[in-house]
Amino acid sequence: MNIGWFSTGRDEAARQLLQAARDKVRSGNINGKISFVFSNREPGEAKESDLFFELVRSYNIPLVCLSHKRFKTTKEEDLGIKKEWRIKYHREVNKRIEPFAPDLCILAGYMLIVNEELCQKYDMINLHPAPPGGPTGSWQEVIWALIENEADTAGAMMHLVTPELDRGPVVSYCLFSIKGELFAKYWRKDDKNILFRLIRQHELAREFPLITLTLQSLSRGEVSIKNGKIIDAQGKLISGYNLSCKVDEEVKKNLK
C-alpha cells in the first residue's frame, strides 16, 4: 500500500506521529510504505516545520512542499475567495503528488481544508476526536458537547475525507467509557474542568494507536475502502471497523 502523508508539520506531535507510523512500516506491522510527505509549508517558514522536514529527509521519504501562504501572494486577486483559492491551490498540489500514485492519503496534522476534487480523486482519511455519530468541531468543542449531553462514551474515529467536514464514512473507531469509577466523582462536581481534562487525556492517548492500527488494518485487507464505502475482510459493507480492544492494548503498552 502506497501511503501519501499530508502534514503541516507544525509541532512535535506531527514528528512523533510520523515516527510512529514509520516504525510500524519498518517492523512490518503496516504492509506498505510512506511514498511521500506533503506539506503546505516550505523550508524557512517556521522552526517547527523545518524540524519536521529534517525528520522526513532522515527517513529518505520524498518531501513535497507548496506554501499556501506564498501561493496566496503569487496568484491573482480573485484567490481571496477561499473556495476558489482552495480549488486552485489543491489542483497544484495534485500535479505534484500524482506521480507517486498513492493508494491512500492520510491527513496527519494537515491544517488546510482539502478541496472537493482532491478528496474525490484519492481515498483520504482523517482523525476526528469523537465517536461515530458524535459531536463535530474541534476537540475542545467535542469534549464540552459530550459533557453537556452527559454521554456514556467518548472516543475517536478515522473517517473518509469528504466535502462535508467531519462527516465522511467512518473507516475505523475506538470507544471508551467516561462513566466508570475513574470518571464518576468528576461528573458530580459543579466544576467540570477536571472532567474535561481527564476525558482529553484518555482520548489523546488513543489517537496515535488508532491511526497506526487503521493503517495496519487497511494494509492487511481487514478493512477496505471501495468506491467511498467501507468494506470488511468478507466484502460486507460496514459502518466502521471497531479497533477499541486493539487500541486499548496499545495504550496499556505505552503506559508501561
Stretches with model-predicted labels:
Residues 1-256:
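One-carbon transfer enzymes
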